[in-house]
Swiss-Prot record:
Organism of origin: Homo sapiens
Region (Disordered): 20-71
Superkingdom of this protein's organism: Eukaryota
Keyword set, alphabetical order: Cleavage on pair of basic residues, Disulfide bond, Hormone, Osteogenesis, Pharmaceutical, Secreted, Signal, Vasoactive
One cellular component (GO) term of this entry: extracellular region
Pfam families, sorted: ANP
GO biological process annotation, one example: multicellular organismal locomotion
Name listed for the protein in its UniProt record: C-type natriuretic peptide
InterPro entries for this protein: C_natriurtcpep (IPR002406), Natr_peptide (IPR000663), Natr_peptide_CS (IPR030480)
Length: 126
C-alpha cells in the first residue's frame, strides 16, 4: 500500500470517528436527515394539488424555494468532496511514466540510454 493511500485512510478514519457532538460541543446534535432526493420529492407531493399561480397559505412559497436551493447547494458540496477524495486515492494515470528509466543516473545499458540507442544503430554497442 502506498504511503499516500495509508495517510488518506488514516485521515478518513479519524474524521469518521469524530461525531458532530464531539467536534462542536456548543452545537445541538443533528437529527438524521432523509436523502436529498426524497426531500425534494416531498414538497412536490404535498403541494401537488396547487397550480403555479397559487401561493401557499402563509407565504410558504418563498420558504420552499429556499429549502430547494439549500438542498441543491448541499448536493453540490457533497459531489465536490467526493471528487476530491477520488482524485486523492486514485493512482496517477501516468504512473509508469514516473518509474524507472526516467530518473537521472539510471541507465539501461552499459553506456546509458541515449548512447545505447546510437550504439545499437551503428553496431558499436557492448
Amino acid at each position: 500500500m502506498h504511503l499516500s493511500q495509508l495517510l488518506a485512510c488514516a485521515l478518513l478514519l479519524t474524521l469518521l470517528s469524530l461525531r458532530p457532538s464531539e467536534a462542536k460541543p456548543g452545537a445541538p446534535p443533528k437529527v438524521p436527515r432523509t436523502p436529498p432526493a426524497e426531500e425534494l420529492a416531498e414538497p412536490q407531493a404535498a403541494g401537488g394539488g396547487q397550480k403555479k399561480g397559487d401561493k401557499a397559505p402563509g407565504g410558504g412559497g418563498a420558504n420552499l424555494k429556499g429549502d430547494r436551493s439549500r438542498l441543491l447547494r448541499d448536493l453540490r458540496v457533497d459531489t465536490k468532496s467526493r471528487a476530491a477524495w477520488a482524485r486523492l486515492l486514485q493512482e496517477h494515470p501516468n504512473a509508469r511514466k514516473y518509474k524507472g528509466a526516467n530518473k537521472k543516473g539510471l541507465s539501461k545499458g552499459c553506456f546509458g540510454l541515449k548512447l545505447d540507442r546510437i550504439g545499437s544503430m551503428s553496431g558499436l554497442g557492448c
